Amino acid sequence: MKLLVLYRPNSEFARTVEEFIQTLRVQQNIDERQLEILDFDSREGSATASLYDIIAQPGFVVVGDDGGFIKSWQGNELPLAEEVASYTLSY
């Protein structure tokens, strides 16, 4: 299972997203193998956003080991860290 995080590092949401990522790492024990952070405007980030229909940033996508879509959240209201962790750790 992997969590993809798509955001613009120089946006007004950057600090909030980075704090959220830190919360996932510390409180929810999400490690680097389960987390991929992408710049929304990079080639890879843009392709990933298109693949999973993420049109607003920040975007969070939980995918299976095969890359299959499981759950996503997007926009300025972040999901609860516990909810993200439950999807990431239970599949």
Question: For each predicted feature, which ranges?
Answer:
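Short, well-ordered coil loops that connect the C-terminus of an alpha-helix to the N-terminus
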Residues: 30-31, 54
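Structural micro-motif
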Residues: 52-62
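Non-catalytic, surface beta->alpha helical segment in thiol-disulfide oxidoreductase systems
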Residues: 62-91
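Short beta-strand-centered segments that line the small-molecule binding cleft or hinge
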Residues: 49
